[in-house]
Amino acid sequence: MLAKILLLLLLCGSGSIVVYAREFNINCNSNLVMYWGQNSRGVTNPGENQLPLDEYCDKESGDVLVLSFLSEFNADGLHPPGLNLANACVTTFTNTTLLHCPNIGKAITHCQKQGKVVLLSMGGAAGAYGFADDTQAER
């Protein structure tokens, strides 16, 4: 086994090994989907917070990133949507509870330029959301 590894390194040459970022391929059945936004990194690495979204696009092998979560929407038709992205948004728009997340838009654009698909997950484990019927959901 060691001989095969050494042969591979010899054939590749030192310094010529390149790691390529993955891109979403709709015809592939091995795309990797990752959730981002609920500080799951802090769960697996206590004391550490999630990295900014664009850093995951630069470093990780994921093809699709799902932003988690749009936790409140259409609850009563009177309130703006509620977004929960853990530590990614720390301010709100003036006189509202609507989060202001200017870096998220830039990060999404950055990720898309790298061939990543970025989606927004509606719902989550808890929250106020739902639709009365299919017609309301389609609007």
Region spans (language model):
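N-terminal signal peptide
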Residues: L2, L10-N27
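Chitinase-like catalytic core of GlcNAc-active glycosidases
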Residues: Y20-R139
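Terminal targeting and flexible regions in eukaryotic proteins, enriched
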Residues: L2-C12, Y35, V66
